[in-house]
Amino acid sequence: MREENGRQESKFPEGRRININFFWFIIIILTSIIATAVITALSLEAGSEKAVNVGTDTRSEFSKLYNVYDTINANYYEDVDREALIESSIQGMVEGLDDPYSEYMNNEELAQFQESVTGDFEGIGAEVMQEGNRVIITSPMRGSPAEEAGIEPGDEIIAVDDESIEGWTTQEAVQLIRGEKGTDVVLTIVRGEGDPMDVTITRDTIHIDSVTYEEIEGVGHVSINRFQEGTAEEFENKLNMASEDGVEDIIIDFRYNPGGLLDEAVSMINQFIEQNETVLYLEENGGERTEIKTSDDRNDSTEDFNIYILINEGSASASEVFTGALDDLTDATIAGTKSFGKGVVQRTVELGGDSLLKYTNTKWLTPNGTWIHGEGITPDIELVNPDYYRVTMLDPEEVYTEGVSNETVKSIKVALDTLGYDVGDFNETFDASLTETVENFQADNEIEETGDVTGETSTLIMSELREYANSNDAQLDYLINHINGEYTEEEIEEYAEERAQHLEIKDPMNHSLQDADDEDQSTEE
C-alpha cells in the first residue's frame, strides 16, 4: 500500500491542497466533540440554574421580600446580620397567620419546647413565684439539689451569683438560676426575718413527673400537670396504685393543664375505653375526617372506678381531648369550671439549624363530633373558686389608707376576711372599720400599727394568703365532700357560689392559652 493512502487530502477555497496525517485528523475530531459536549453541558447547567433563580425571584408574593432584603443589604448604614434578617422574616411570616398556637422556634426556644415535651431540664429543682416585687421559693422538689442544699418554702431569693435580682420577674430569675449539670449557682436568700445568707447549689438534671397520686378521705386523687413523653405510663401506674388501695371513687385533675402530646392523651383514654373505639376525630381544612382509635385493651384496674374529672379555665387541648372522650363514652362526672376551649392540633417540622416550625394543621372533635374550640367544656357540677383566689396582688410601694376607694380595697377586705379578720362590708371604701382591722393584723404580726396597707403589711398579707391558698384547695375539697355524701350537687354548687360573691369572676374565654398557663404562679426551676 502506498504511503499516500495514510493521508487525507483537503482543498481550501483558494484551491490550495494541504495534506493532513490521518491520526491527527481523528484526534482533532475527537477533541472537538468532547469540547462541544462540555460546553453544551455547562450551558445547560447554567441555563437550568438561571431558570430556577428566575422562577423563584419572579414569584410575585416574594418580590417585596427580596426587594427589602436586597435594599437593606446594599444600602443600610451599618453592616447587616443577614441571618437575623432571615430569622425575623420567618418569624413575621408565621405571626401573619394570627394563630396563637403556630410559632417558629429558634435554637433557644426549641430547647425550651423539648423540655416541655420530655419533662427534663438542668437546674436546681425548685418552684418559684412572683410575690409583689419579690421572687419566692414555693417548694423545692423532692430529692432535688435545692432540697438537699436546705432550701425551704417561703425563702426569698434576693441575688444569684452575687447579682441582685431586685425588680426581676420569675422568668428572668429562672434563666439566671438554670445552668449546665454539674455547675454551681449561689443563691442569696432571706428566710423570715433573718439576715441574707448564701446557699451554694450544684445543678443537676431534673425530671418533672407529670402525674401525682394521693388518697384523700377515701378518694383517689390523680393530678396531671402536662402531657409529656411517658405521661400515659405514669398515669397507668397511679391508677393501678389507686386500685390496690381499694378506692372506688377517683378524681382525675386537669386544672391548669395546658395540654401537650396528643398520643399520650389517647393512650390515657385507652385506660378506660376498650380497644378499637373512636376517641376523637381529626378534621382537615377540606372537611375530611380521620378517626383516632384506641389500640390496646382497657386497664382492668379501672373497671370499678367512679370517675370524676376536675377542670378549670386553664384546662386546654389534650386535657379537653381526654375530658371530651370520657364525657361522650362513659358516665364520668365533670366538675369545676368551664375549660379553656382549644380545639385545634399542631404539627411540628424540623427546619435545620436547630430550628422548628409548629403550626396548626387540623381541628379535633369529640367522639360525638363536637368541636369545643372557643367554647370549652361545661362541667356537670360547677365549682367556682372562693374570692381569695382572685385577690389583686398588692404592691408594697402603693399606700392604701382610710378614705381611699377602689377595687383593690375590696381585695384587701377579702384577704383579711380569709385570714380570719372581721372587715365589715365588702365594698370598695377604706373606712374606719378597716383601719382598725389592719391595726389588729399589724399587732398580731408585730408591725407598727399605722392602719395603712403598704410596705411590709402588704407583703405579709399576700404571703399569709398564699400559704392559706396552698393548704386549702377549695375546688378539690368541694368535690371530695360531694363524693363522700356531705352535700348534694345543688348544695355544693350553692356553697361554692356563696364563697365567690365579692370579686368578679372573669369569663375564661377571655383568657389566652398563655394566660391559662401563667394562671398557676409557680414556675418549675
Give the ranges of each region predicted by the language model.
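Intrinsically disordered, Ser/Thr/Pro/Gly-rich linkers and terminal tails that flank
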Residues: 2-130, 152, 165, 172-215, ...
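Conserved P-loop NTPase
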Residues: 346-349, 359-390
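Glycine-rich active-site/cofactor-binding loop and its immediate structural neighborhood
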Residues: 120-161
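PDZ/PDZ-like groove recognition
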Residues: 127-141, 221-223, 390-395, 404-418, ...
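Cleft-lining beta-strand/loop regions that shape enzyme active-site pockets
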Residues: 138, 147-149, 153, 161-164, ...
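Generic structural signal for buried aliphatic residues
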Residues: 157-158, 185, 372, 416
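A short amphipathic alpha-helical interaction element
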Residues: 146, 400-464
